[in-house]
Amino acid sequence: MVTLPLLLSILPLAAVFSSAASLQVRENHDCASIQPPQVPGAEILSVIGVQRRVEVAPFPPSPSKPNTTIDICSVNVTLSHMGVNDKVVVSVWLPLPDKWNGRFQATGGGGWAAGTFDLLMGPAALEGYSTAGTDAGVTVDPGSADKWALKEDGTVNYDLLENFASRSIHDMAIVGKAVTESYYKKPANYSYFYGCSNGGRQGMVEAQKYPDDFDGILAGAPAIYWPQFLTSTEWPQVVMQSEKVFPSQCVFEAFRKAGIAACDKLDGVEDGVVSNLDGCEFNPFALVGKKVKCGEESTTITLAQAWVAKKIYDGPKSTAKHALWDVLPVGASYVGLANSTIENGVPKIAPFVIGSSWIRSFLKKDVNFDLSTITYADMPKLFQQSIDEFDKIAGGSNPDLSALKKSGTKLLSWHGLADELIHPQGSIKYRQAVEHRMGGGSEVDNYYRLFLAPGVTHCGIGVNDGAAPIDTLKVLVRWVEKGEAPETMPATATDASGTTTLFTRNLCRYPLVPRYKGGDKNSADSFECAKDFGSHH
């Protein structure tokens, strides 16, 4: 039974990888004498720098790749915003001077954690980047905001929400670049942001509000339209609770596989991946009466289970059948949002922790609120309340990228088409809104490009049906530093061990799609980026 969704499995619940070791200080690069940075609107409380030897785990996580040990200067800058009474920690890791590549990389968070720290900072430092992460002054708990969302009087803590939503990412850029310059005695040649999920949202917010912070921003699977996205994660739970039907993950997996089988060929090649989502129509009721093997036993799909699967696939709707948010993409897993559990023989909902924290703390303003009481009729009201109260501060979906265009900064985004948590339609919707606002696709391509990855899960972590992008940051660096605007992004599908490549693909620049030309379907060379998939029946 999966109790914590995939999103949390990629996040360290505590930064515990590191062990300190004393090292000789080289040349004039004194880790203990970092100059306090100047942060507008904030007071620096402390700057503590120590030489450390840290163990870096590979990212994405891989059981076959060993950890690596590197020496760094580790600097913690603690600051407080004027009149807020918060305490924000920005952690900066600096490779020793002979290992520095001359670049700075800020790293993003995931879930309710503003920073993932070691998880992303370690690999960045290993590549030679000076790198930073921030806790935004909130608890480093990716699963919940319950401990900080509300003030003692029961009202929303808008100061900390603003930290989490945008302010602390900007602060991290200022602090990280200043500490980098203080240590190496010269500024970074180029600065980058790297994040996925909430980290992707952070990157999009930087592009919208503070584009001068970075030369390049990589935003994977961005959790933009944050109020709508988080509210929508409760929909599968409302469906199961309302219908009093709680299909097992094995039954849900049968529906997922049937959806892939129904739509796989629409892109011209049968490869276990749905690339043509727009042309895909899947009828869950076709499975009624079919037997599926679940462990040692077989079970028969019921009409009630198919009805639940259909309602979840169709996405949140009002009682008048008005769409409130996006549908679950065919091929995406139900695991994560449609979990249930059994207590004393009785099936119960098991809500997605990140979304349930949103509803409890920010919408209901009651950390003890019982989510099982939410009905179909409640959903439109929750969506509207979410937008009304929080879109301005946390939406991350402003299509006006005038400042980004003017800054010269490049924004590179990608999204898995089988993202089970943050559905890819949000990224497509946002890109279309930007095109409408900023003068069309070819104009926007000068500074913002989107790549879609068929069959790829949330942030590409774990086993994917499709090919997940690799070397995404290198693609961005080439665009920023050499002017090589990407038409494609390399991607690979691997086995569960992560060591064997099953097939390769080139992800296409939106709105182009991968059209099969013929030949070995496991080779990226057998596909071309085209305006459509061609005619297939």
UniProtKB/Swiss-Prot annotation:
Protein biosynthesis found in the keyword field: no
Binding site residues for Ca(2+): 264, 267, 269, 271, 273
User: What Enzyme Commission number(s) does the record list for this chain?
Assistant: 3.1.1.73
Predominant cellular place of this UniProt entry's protein: secreted
Q: Which residues have a glycan attached per UniProt?
A: 67, 76, 189, 339
**Record-annotated disulphide pairs:** 196-459, 263-280, 508-529
Query: What top-level class of enzyme does the UniProt entry assign?
Result: hydrolase
Which keywords appear in this protein's UniProt record, sorted alphabetically? Calcium, Carbohydrate metabolism, Disulfide bond, Glycoprotein, Hydrolase, Metal-binding, Polysaccharide degradation, Secreted, Serine esterase, Signal, Xylan degradation
Q: State any GO BP term from the record.
A: xylan catabolic process
Q: What does this protein do?
A: Hydrolyzes the feruloyl-arabinose ester bond in arabinoxylans as well as the feruloyl-galactose and feruloyl-arabinose ester bonds.
In which family does this protein belong, per the annotation?
Belongs to the tannase family.
Please identify the protein, giving its name as recorded: Probable feruloyl esterase ARB_07085
Q: What is the lineage of its organism?
A: Eukaryota, Fungi, Dikarya, Ascomycota, Pezizomycotina
